Amino acid sequence: MVYTSLSSKDGNYPYQLNIAHLYGNLMNTYGDNGNILMLKYVAEKLGAHVTVDIVSLHDDFDENHYDIAFFGGGQDFEQSIIADDLPAKKESIDNYIQNDGVVLAICGGFQLLGQYYVEASGKRIEGLGVMGHYTLNQTNNRFIGDIKIHNEDFDETYYGFENHQGRTFLSDDQKPLGQVVYGNGNNEEKVGEGVHYKNVFGSYFHGPILSRNANLAYRLVTTALKKKYGQDIQLPAYEDILSQEIAEEYSDVKSKADFS
């Protein structure tokens, strides 16, 4: 049963955003609730009342109701359970994506939107198949460490931490979320990280990604608001509401920490 897990306090909000947390009771291994909280924080700064629903096993995904869908990461066991449930949601999620619905997909969620992924054990798990990427495993190796990427289309830089065994390869109609400045990225080619397709943003960044990259959170929320209320909607600039939320490299954070 779909249920509301989080909602803005009552107030005079000019806008409303409905967020679907896909399998939020199962896929929350990497602090993904922090991404939900950041979406809510930024949306409220922009004048939007937020309602977050958990859409999980045997639930319908209402493509016309939700303005943002978040699909987080999980362990192989949970992902295999979800992979069995996803086909019932395929049509609605595919329609949502093709109609420019806003999606943030992290780690396992990113993998499951694609064609398939191969577990560390070598077992192939079928993905939802609504996007063209696929994920292979690797032997005795993981991509672990700090990572920095740059999105040339948006001229934005994102920072994160990666820890993944999978090697993801994008299809010809997909772009990476960003070009790798340092770190590994999607695979051993160390060229791109994540995916950007229509209004789908996928990444392997743990963290959670949005707490460290408020510029990306702002982009997701403003994209959703403009889609719902029109491109001419007047919204506060990023600098006006999030001037203190500057993305920082790990080295910068360490140098500013007070250990006294």
UniProtKB/Swiss-Prot annotation:
<dbReference type="InterPro" id="IPR011698">
    <property type="entry name" value="GATase_3"/>
</dbReference>
<comment type="subunit">
    <text>Forms a heterodimer with MurT.</text>
</comment>
<dbReference type="InterPro" id="IPR043702">
    <property type="entry name" value="Lipid_II_synth_GatD"/>
</dbReference>
<comment type="similarity">
    <text>Belongs to the CobB/CobQ family. GatD subfamily.</text>
</comment>
<keyword id="KW-0961">Cell wall biogenesis/degradation</keyword>
<keyword id="KW-0133">Cell shape</keyword>
<keyword id="KW-0378">Hydrolase</keyword>
<keyword id="KW-0573">Peptidoglycan synthesis</keyword>
<dbReference type="Pfam" id="PF07685">
    <property type="entry name" value="GATase_3"/>
</dbReference>
<feature type="binding site">
    <location>
        <position position="142"/>
    </location>
    <ligand>
        <name>substrate</name>
    </ligand>
</feature>
<dbReference type="InterPro" id="IPR054859">
    <property type="entry name" value="isoglutsynth_GatD"/>
</dbReference>
<comment type="function">
    <text>The lipid II isoglutaminyl synthase complex catalyzes the formation of alpha-D-isoglutamine in the cell wall lipid II stem peptide. The GatD subunit catalyzes the hydrolysis of glutamine to glutamate and ammonia. The resulting ammonia molecule is channeled to the active site of MurT.</text>
</comment>
<dbReference type="GO" id="GO:0140282">
    <property type="term" value="F:carbon-nitrogen ligase activity on lipid II"/>
</dbReference>
<dbReference type="GO" id="GO:0009252">
    <property type="term" value="P:peptidoglycan biosynthetic process"/>
</dbReference>
<comment type="pathway">
    <text>Cell wall biogenesis; peptidoglycan biosynthesis.</text>
</comment>
<dbReference type="InterPro" id="IPR033949">
    <property type="entry name" value="CobQ_GATase1"/>
</dbReference>
<feature type="domain" description="GATase cobBQ-type">
    <location>
        <begin position="16"/>
        <end position="214"/>
    </location>
</feature>
<dbReference type="GO" id="GO:0009236">
    <property type="term" value="P:cobalamin biosynthetic process"/>
</dbReference>
<dbReference type="GO" id="GO:0071555">
    <property type="term" value="P:cell wall organization"/>
</dbReference>
<dbReference type="GO" id="GO:0004359">
    <property type="term" value="F:glutaminase activity"/>
</dbReference>
<dbReference type="GO" id="GO:0008360">
    <property type="term" value="P:regulation of cell shape"/>
</dbReference>
<protein>
    <recommendedName>
        <fullName>Lipid II isoglutaminyl synthase (glutamine-hydrolyzing) subunit GatD</fullName>
        <ecNumber>6.3.5.13</ecNumber>
        <ecNumber>3.5.1.2</ecNumber>
    </recommendedName>
</protein>
<dbReference type="InterPro" id="IPR029062">
    <property type="entry name" value="Class_I_gatase-like"/>
</dbReference>
<feature type="active site" description="Nucleophile">
    <location>
        <position position="107"/>
    </location>
</feature>
<keyword id="KW-0315">Glutamine amidotransferase</keyword>
<keyword id="KW-0436">Ligase</keyword>
<feature type="active site">
    <location>
        <position position="206"/>
    </location>
</feature>
